[in-house]
Amino acid sequence: MSNANDANNKMVATAEGLTSDAFHRLLELAITGRGKLLGARTVANNQLRHHHDHEAAIRWLSNQHIALAGGQGFATNWGGFLLSLVTIPANMAAAAFIQARAVAAIAHLRGYELDDPRVRTAILMAMLGPRGSAALIAAGDLPSSAAAVATAPAFDPRLDSRVSRALLEQSMNHVGGKRLGVFLAKKIPLVGGGVGAVVDGWSTRSIIQYAQEQFISRRPRSAGYVIIMES
């Protein structure tokens, strides 16, 4: 059954022009932003200026991004724009962008360099969520946790490739599950339209909680309020 699902996901991904490299492009967009679509650094620093505390900024960002994922407005307003930039199906792109930006913002506020390729691999690993990451580590497909990868001695391009492929496969499974859920929910009045948003909200909450566990603060306790500007 697993092989059949994998084959089906590959066919769907091919038909939709989706490759694992799309998640690298999406992460770049989530970090840097584009026009009115703010990137992780900007969102994080804006909240840090407002709250004057890194952890308070993280709490606010977490709640904001969970709400964005659980609503339908972001996908409606930005899904087509994201599709034009990263060739990911609009319904997948909106949720993945929100999750990538939230995780990157958490890493930024915890003192990680977002231009470091090790950190970017770790962000993609965090986007797999706790269950996805644990399953791949147990199977030997991933050597360690996102926390260890972010601070590894050197960048491992083969690991980065494996992580992005795993994220692609998981995302295709996720989309398939949402489609089934929406199909079934259409049989129930007043429910069908919100099922996909509920799934995205739940998965985003799980990913954000996992990211907070993995990206342990690298700031001294006495560091105080500092705006981090990366080159």
Residue map of PLM features:
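Structural signature of FAD isoalloxazine-binding scaffolds in flavoprotein oxidoreductases
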Residues: 93-102
